[in-house]
């Protein structure tokens, strides 16, 4: 009898070609065969379905002239452009957001130095325009418009066209010059002037008569007085003399006084300063192209929406922040649990507790069902969109917080300011170290939150279905519910869209639940019968063995001795 029942069950399993059990609906999430590893607060390697790289490492091979206006200095740096050196005439009236200085820029006029080079360079760059206003200067009994063979323009001796070299008169006179200019305008004026340092005393007297000369330039709040430093120097473009250029800013209502008895390189006017402008300068050999980008580095323009970059510390415009890391991945999907390859003899389905689902194209979260009409999969767009909105929101905020506008991280200093340069680099290195650490921590925190959010949305979906089904179904513990009533595809759809009415199916579900539990109870006796049968069989086998031994002993076939 027992063997017949077992044989019947085996035949039923092998011959079953369609699903005849109770309907089952499962909640699950999207998965892929190979996810992306991200870092969280608690784990260095967490596999997620999708992630976005936040660190940009690629640049365009050119500088983009739009939307920022770029001015190419070509062979002229910005100071030579302001002085009016030969070869820099193309910069007259130039206006820029970023002034492009080239590493191969050269001086083309009389050799000079600027004691406060970096400050003047910064003022000119920030001004964003070479707006030169010519003025009338009444110099007394001196020869103007001095020229030099070191300063050729069209193969003719010339000089800086924004400056006026004053020398003694033909009558061998260089009287005291005392000239005042009042700023009656509504903007600040930048005056650039110089002091000539001859190579010998003879040159000093030949040019200016007075030895030593002196130049004093004053405003209401400042005064600069320079005595020429006469001495021989290495020849540069045939000259051993030098010019030192200085600058003075005259605010509206203030005045400037030039006082000299020789050696003055006088201005021909002033530059109009625009305090509202926020421009800058970039030293790079990268050519200007025809692309569009709001971010420029010395290695090329950057076109990206990533919040970080490890291309260059020097970044100008609306640029990602520079970090040391080569990669920071932000999770944009849930934790990845690859789908199992096999689903068993019945093709059984499982929910999110066991694994994810591959091929859930329409959304991250969804349903799978199994009923008399077959199996199916559908996305749950509401929970998916809720998670996407939260992730996109944090990504946008991250990008918005880290964009830099017209910020140059690394500055340049001349050799005289070496100690300042070392200090500045130390400060910048420290800032970059701190920000790189903060960026890594921020991304890890966001990744942790993303995984928590996506897990939470999955649990919300599961709880929503559980509240709908109530006693009409049983939680199988793997993200699925076994439904105790007939549930066709329309019924399944009502569960998915939240319109399921459990009262309609309540009576049928209760009856089926009791019947199924009764069958399970009856089927439970099979195990008891099997154990009883096994025990009786073992007892009979032992009894037969003992009977055989006793029979053999009586017939003398077996001899038994007991020793004490």
Curated annotation (Swiss-Prot):
Signal peptide annotation: 1-16
Gene: HA
Assigned keywords, A-Z: Clathrin- and caveolin-independent endocytosis of virus by host, Clathrin-mediated endocytosis of virus by host, Disulfide bond, Fusion of virus membrane with host endosomal membrane, Fusion of virus membrane with host membrane, Glycoprotein, Hemagglutinin, Host cell membrane, Host membrane, Host-virus interaction, Lipoprotein, Membrane, Palmitate, Signal, Transmembrane, Transmembrane helix, Viral attachment to host cell, Viral envelope protein, Viral penetration into host cytoplasm, Virion, Virus endocytosis by host, Virus entry into host cell
Family (UniProt): Belongs to the influenza viruses hemagglutinin family.
Positions of transmembrane segments: 528-548
Subunit structure: Homotrimer of disulfide-linked HA1-HA2.
Annotated source species: Influenza A virus (strain A/Budgerigar/Hokkaido/1/1977 H4N6)
S-palmitoyl cysteine lipid modification positions: 553, 560, 563
Protein name according to UniProt: Hemagglutinin
């Amino acid at each position: 009898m027992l063997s017949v029942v077992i044989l019947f069950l085996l035949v039923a399993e092998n011959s079953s070609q369609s699903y005849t059990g109770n309907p089952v609906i499962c909640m699950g999430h999207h998965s892929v065969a190979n996810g992306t590893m991200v870092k969280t607060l608690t784990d260095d390697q967490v596999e997620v379905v999708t992630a976005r790289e936040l660190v940009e490492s690629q640049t365009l091979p050119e500088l983009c002239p739009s939307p920022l206006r770029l001015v190419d200095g070509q062979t002229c740096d910005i100071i030579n452009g302001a002085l009016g050196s030969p070869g820099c005439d193309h910069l007259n009236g130039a206006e820029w957001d970023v002034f492009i200085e080239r590493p191969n820029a050269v001086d083309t006029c009389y050799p000079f130095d600027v004691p406060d080079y970096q400050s003047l360079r910064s003022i000119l760059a920030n001004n964003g325009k070479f707006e030169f206003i010519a003025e009338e200067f009444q110099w007394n009994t001196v020869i103007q418009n001095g020229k030099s063979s070191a300063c050729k323009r069209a193969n003719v001796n010339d000089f800086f066209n924004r400056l006026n070299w004053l020398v003694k008169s033909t009558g061998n006179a260089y009287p005291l010059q005392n000239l005042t200019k009042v700023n009656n305008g509504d903007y600040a004026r930048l005056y650039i002037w110089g002091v000539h340092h001859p190579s010998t005393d003879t040159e000093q007297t030949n040019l200016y008569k007075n030895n030593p000369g002196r130049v004093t330039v004053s405003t209401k709040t400042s005064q600069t007085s320079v005595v020429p430093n006469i001495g021989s120097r290495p020849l540069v473009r045939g000259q051993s003399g030098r010019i030192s250029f200085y600058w003075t800013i005259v605010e509206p209502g203030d005045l400037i006084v030039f006082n000299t008895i020789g050696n003055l390189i006088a201005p021909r006017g002033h530059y109009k300063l625009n305090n509202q402008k926020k421009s800058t300068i970039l030293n790079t050999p990268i050519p200007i192209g025809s692309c569009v980008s709001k971010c420029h580095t010395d290695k090329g323009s950057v076109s990206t929406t990533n919040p970080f970059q490890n291309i260059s510390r020097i970044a100008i415009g609306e640029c990602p922040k520079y970090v040391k890391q080569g990669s920071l991945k932000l999770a944009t999907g849930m934790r990845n649990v690859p789908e199992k390859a096999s689903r068993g003899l019945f093709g059984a389905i499982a929910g999110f507790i066991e694994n994810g689902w591959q091929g859930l194209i329409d959304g991250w979260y969804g349903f799978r069902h199994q009923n008399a009409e077959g199996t199916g999969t559908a996305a749950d767009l509401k929970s998916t969109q809720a998670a996407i909105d939260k992730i996109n929101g944090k990504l946008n905020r991250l990008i918005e917080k880290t964009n830099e506008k017209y910020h140059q991280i690394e500055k340049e200093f001349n050799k005289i300011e070496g100690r300042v340069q070392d200090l500045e680099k130390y400060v910048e290195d420290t800032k970059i170290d701190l920000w790189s650490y903060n960026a890594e921590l921020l991304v890890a925190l966001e990744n942790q939150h993303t995984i928590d959010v996506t897990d939470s949305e999955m649990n919300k979906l599961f709880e929503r279905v559980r509240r709908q089904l109530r006693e009409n179904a049983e939680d199988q513990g793997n993200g699925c519910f076994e439904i105790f009533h007939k549930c066709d595809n329309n019924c399944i759809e009502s569960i998915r869209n939240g319109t399921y009415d459990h009262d309609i199916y309540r009576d049928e579900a209760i009856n089926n639940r009791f019947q199924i539990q009764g069958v399970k109870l009856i089927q439970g006796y099979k195990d008891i019968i099997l154990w009883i049968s096994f025990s009786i069989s073992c007892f009979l086998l032992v009894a037969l063995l003992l009977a055989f031994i006793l029979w053999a002993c009586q017939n003398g076939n077996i001899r038994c001795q007991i020793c004490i």
